[in-house]
C-alpha cells in the first residue's frame, strides 16, 4: 500500500479505483488490480 498526500491523481490511474473513507482515513481500493491500493497520510 502506498501512502500519499493527494489521492485524486491516483484515483484516475485506473477505472476501477474507488475512494473509500474508513475510520477517518481516506483509501483507494481496487478489486481487479490490487496494486493500486493507497492511503492518504
Swiss-Prot record:
GO terms for molecular function: structural constituent of ribosome. This is Large ribosomal subunit protein bL36. InterPro entries: Ribosomal_bL36 (IPR000473), Ribosomal_bL36_sp (IPR035977), Ribosomal_L36_bact (IPR047621). Pfam families: Ribosomal_L36. PANTHER family: 50S RIBOSOMAL PROTEIN L36 2, LARGE RIBOSOMAL SUBUNIT PROTEIN BL36B. GO terms for cellular component: ribonucleoprotein complex; ribosome. Keywords: Ribonucleoprotein, Ribosomal protein. It comes from Parvibaculum lavamentivorans (strain DS-1 / DSM 13023 / NCIMB 13966). The keyword Ribosomal protein applies. PROSITE patterns: RIBOSOMAL_L36 (PS00828). Belongs to the bacterial ribosomal protein bL36 family. The keyword Ribonucleoprotein applies.
